[in-house]
Amino acid sequence: MLEEKFLDLLAQKYDSEEKVVTEIINLEAILDLPKGTEHFVSDLHGEYQAFQHVLRNGSGKVKEKIRDIFKHELSEKEINEFATLIYYPEEKLQLIRNQFDNKQELNAWYTKTIDQMIRLIPYASSKYTRTKLRKALPKQFVYIIEELLYKTDEYTNKKHYYSKIVQKVISLGQADKLIIGLAYTTQQLVVDHLHVVGDIYDRGPEPDKIMEALINYHSLDIQWGNHDVLWIGAFSGSKVCLANILRICARYDNLDIIEDVYGINLRPLLNLAEKYYKDNPAFRPKRHSNKKLSDQEQSQITKIHQAIAMIQFKLEMPIIKRRPYFNMSKRLLLEKVDYENNKITIDGKTYPLENTCFATVNPDQPDELLEEEKQVMDKLLFSVQHSEKLARHMEFLMKKGTLYLRYNGNLLIHGCIPIDENGNMEKMFIENKTYAGRELLDIFENYLLHAFSNREATDDLATDMVWYLWTGEYSSLFGKREMTTFERYFIKDKALHKERKNPYYYLREKEGICRMILEEFDLDPDQGHIINGHTPVKEIEGENPIKANGKMIVIDGGFSKAYQPTTGIAGYTLLYNSFGMQLVAHQHFNSKEDVLQNGNDVLSVKRLVDEELERKKISETNIGEKLIEDINMLNSLLKYRYLK
């Protein structure tokens, strides 16, 4: 009965036998096309400039296509110039126009360049239907471009007609707009789908611009990282997540993200900080090489940093106490401080404290917030939850994001799957029930969704669980035994700063472990891979990003400048097309200007991870599964409505 109702509804769209048959033929044909190119990036950490370059060049795919077509016509220098025009059309056109003294020479350049771009588009779109290509073309030029794309030299009757179209575009002053449109179309055609494997946010200065770029991207999904979840948590009502964000922004001198970008007023926090705190070397912001700070600004940030860190430590304590199964009582450090002698006892050993800032702490009840601190946090939370721009970014993050993704036979995950040293899934006890493996990640995601849709609740289990995802030992995003923030600020002994990683991080080198994890997520261990972000690959020390006989691929894009000295390169991205998987290593990205002026690209080498024996078709992908369902439904409609 229900199926008949659905078929009646479907018949409104396909109201003739011809329409149904045409759609079935169309979908069956699409199933036979090669799968599109997937592009995997990870750990963007707010570094917009480096990220958008990788997005524009498709991790080298754009230049590869240019080279395939023009290798016998253009020199290496000309190929680089052409590639730069496709990456940054507006800026490159400006530079090129300035090189010409007369209009004739410029027009000749326009004619040649438009012709080259029109030749590149069919090659870049060879895996797509005409309908899909039409959707990617710049709207105002669709008719003109299609005329130029589908010309054939079989008959020469139209040669003059095609030439006239291009000359008219130039004489009407539309050449720049056409070239810009074709450049962005090429960028879009080269990558069919983007996977962002976590951490859009962190210490970098422009996560908001990354979010805007992703919102405008044609096709993508996101696997949340630990820093993304922190921002989602703050927006969902978690004051302790909010305190963490503010502390990290103060530490890395990025408070303008909070104030200027998202419009959140920090004046109440500054007033509190000025009242209770002084200069403190442990809390001075990390300097940006390209950003000057006055002494007064440094002093204000140092005080804000202390104020919000102390609020954070206080806010953590009630959560730890009301959720004993978080197993975090060791983190109740403010209760272990000897305030008179400035010492702390941890695991039976006493350590001196330095650079302390306990002015607002009541030694008898260390988790007690001052009335002023409560008011400041209430105001900040209100501002965060009423920031229009932040709401748009967080809603997009939730709409496109998941904790893990099963896609085309692979498992995409930012952090880890918590396992013990014997390789068994670690169990977590929540509300009288035990969870492990995929079930644990599913329950984490349920709590996150619940917290996001109930933002007025600030201390329910769902909101507490979002904070646990940031810092808890069984969190798939944190993947360490404890977070030693307090120790790093106040205790000199480096042994206490160490954060022990989950055994996953050394066991993922073993093929057997990776196969077990793939099976846990109902994926074929012979065909599937785990694609993992979160940890920088220390190439400098000989670490290999391809592990476990090719079953595990670690791609930290290395966009965060802070980690680059430890990795030796900037990082890795991954491409997966119908021929197989390629890992792309990136050098440091200097600046857009460097690319424009010198054609310097940041790609170095590509390594083959896996080669398909036969080209993979759309029928073997997630999209293919959906199309097969549609075809079955249309066949049912055909029988039900038209073949009776």
Swiss-Prot record:
It holds the Pfam family FBPase_2. Gene3D superfamilies: 3.60.21.10. GO terms for biological process: gluconeogenesis. Pathway: Carbohydrate biosynthesis; gluconeogenesis. Keywords: Carbohydrate metabolism, Hydrolase, Manganese. Its cofactor is Mn(2+). One of its GO terms (molecular function) is fructose 1,6-bisphosphate 1-phosphatase activity. Signal peptide: none annotated. Disulfide bonds: none annotated. Its EC number is 3.1.3.11. It catalyses: beta-D-fructose 1,6-bisphosphate + H2O = beta-D-fructose 6-phosphate + phosphate. InterPro entries: FBPtase_class3, Metallo-depent_PP-like. Belongs to the FBPase class 3 family. This is Fructose-1,6-bisphosphatase class 3. It comes from Oceanobacillus iheyensis (strain DSM 14371 / CIP 107618 / JCM 11309 / KCTC 3954 / HTE831).
